């Protein structure tokens, strides 16, 4: 049997790096606002897309629906999002950032942009190639 080199297996490399970077970034927003990684993904998506359903967020950020629902409930409890039922389909719950959520995102976006800029700087001239490769894989 041929040996398998896990360290050169691209999916493994990508998830290890993504997990490390997500953990590093999450310390920044958790310290300031007490939100978790799933909560960050929900509010970041809402900031970009406006009012959307839990189902749409689940599909867009590739998170289990129950995890999205729990994150949305915690965000609602903390006043960052508002939940409303879809009048045409009561099973669908729409999420919207509240003013408090918008204010939080106004403070978080520069932090995220700075984190991203540092990552891209660390790649130097390979940054554009790396972004293109990720886009091709995604």
Sequence positions of predicted segments:
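N-terminal leader segment of winged-helix/HTH proteins
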Residues: 1-32
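Base-recognition residues in the alpha-helical recognition helix of bacterial helix-turn-helix
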Residues: 12, 41-44, 69-70
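N-terminal helix-turn-helix DNA-binding core of bacterial DNA-binding proteins
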Residues: 23-64
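Residues within helix-turn-helix
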Residues: 54-55, 66, 73, 93
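A general lysine-centric signal
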Residues: 65-67, 83
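Charged, amphipathic alpha-helical coiled-coil/dimerization segments
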Residues: 73-132
């Amino acid at each position: 049997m041929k040996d398998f080199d896990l360290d050169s297996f691209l999916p493994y490399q990508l998830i290890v790096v993504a997990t490390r970077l997500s953990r590093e970034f999450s310390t920044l927003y958790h310290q300031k606002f007490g939100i978790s990684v799933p909560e960050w993904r929900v509010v970041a998506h809402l900031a970009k897309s406006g009012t959307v359903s839990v189902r749409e967020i689940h599909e867009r950020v590739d998170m289990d629906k129950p995890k999205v629902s729990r994150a949305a409930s915690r965000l609602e409890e903390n006043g960052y999002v508002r939940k409303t039922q879809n009048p045409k389909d009561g099973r669908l719950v729409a999420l919207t950032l509240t003013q408090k959520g918008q204010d939080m995102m106004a403070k978080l976006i520069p932090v995220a942009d700075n984190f991203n800029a540092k990552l891209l700087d660390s790649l130097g001239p390979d940054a554009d190639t790396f972004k293109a490769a990720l886009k091709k894989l995604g």
